[in-house]
């Protein structure tokens, strides 16, 4: 079992024990993070970024690691999240394999990876861990907490669990609860991993690794991260050249199939399967309605921020834009100056990672007005 930690990653030790929402606790756990910009003397210019399922804390290039980050087009000097003005902190989610303690990490009690002995992970656990980093940096109140995809859930949990922790919020392609379609897709992804004989109840290693299950899980994910409009525009029904196919009568024939296969193969050895299972399930469990007798809008209305922006792509099938509209409506009911923007992007759920021409101005306009 392997962790994948970028150069320049910083670490914060969590309190020991660190209890989990659903029971159990970690001892000697840590959270991975990176920072950009300069914290103001009064610590009033801090922005927290909480991520989706797979990213590490390296959102953009910095002095510690000049390699491009996963949100390079959004974070940096003069960009939408302008590090000339803002002190930006990006936290890798608890439960990940990218630096924060997760199922692939060594259990100090045994000297072996936690595997399935890791406590049941909730979005709220990741939110509490992120705020431990914020407090350690001397920040009492954030100017803004920004979350995308799963990070949109984590950001809402941060705001719910820590009233007054942030003056504003940007929710990008996120939600206040998981929809049945998303739960169904993620359940199939987890099943694909667990049905791979090499998963072996979570006891795999680099030599006996559930690559087939991970590859199928990733393919299912990529299909939901994009849109039919993008598939049509990029691939249509174009077939592979004869020298790109093999003799398997049911093998790869169309370019879109080849794309999925290549994308999945690039991913499977760079993310731990057990971490994938834990983080995926934490998204299914998250529901702000739990905080308001089953009413998600009432749950959102309990959050207190001055301003909020919820944005998404109209082609997103995994976190559809009505969920971002719901976030804006609920926060507005709680007294926030909250707005929703649905963007006409062809790139589906992953649009926030690539469509900076649309997402960038929306985020920049909101932050510039703070």
UniProtKB/Swiss-Prot annotation:
Superkingdom of the organism of origin: Bacteria
Catalysed reactions, semicolon-separated: succinyl-CoA + L-serine = O-succinyl-L-serine + CoA
UniProt GO molecular function: homoserine O-acetyltransferase activity; L-serine O-succinyltransferase activity
Pathway: Amino-acid biosynthesis; L-cysteine biosynthesis; L-cysteine from L-serine: step 1/2
Pfam family, one: Abhydrolase_1
Residues at the active site: 149 (nucleophile), 316, 349
Amino acids binding substrate: 218, 350
Chain residue ranges for the region called Important for substrate specificity: 52-55
Name of the protein described by the UniProt record: Serine O-succinyltransferase
Gene: metX
Cystine connections: none
Quaternary organization: Homodimer.
Species: Stenotrophomonas maltophilia (strain K279a)
Function: Transfers a succinyl group from succinyl-CoA to L-serine, forming succinyl-L-serine.
Site residues by UniProt (Important for acyl-CoA specificity): 186
Gene Ontology annotations for the cellular component aspect, listed alphabetically: cytoplasm
Domain named AB hydrolase-1: residues: 46-355
SUPFAM superfamilies: alpha/beta-Hydrolases (SSF53474)
InterPro entries per the UniProt record, alphabetical: AB_hydrolase_1, AB_hydrolase_fold, HAT_MetX-like
Single biological process term from Gene Ontology: cysteine biosynthetic process from serine
EC numbers for this chain: 2.3.1.-
Family membership: Belongs to the AB hydrolase superfamily. MetX family.
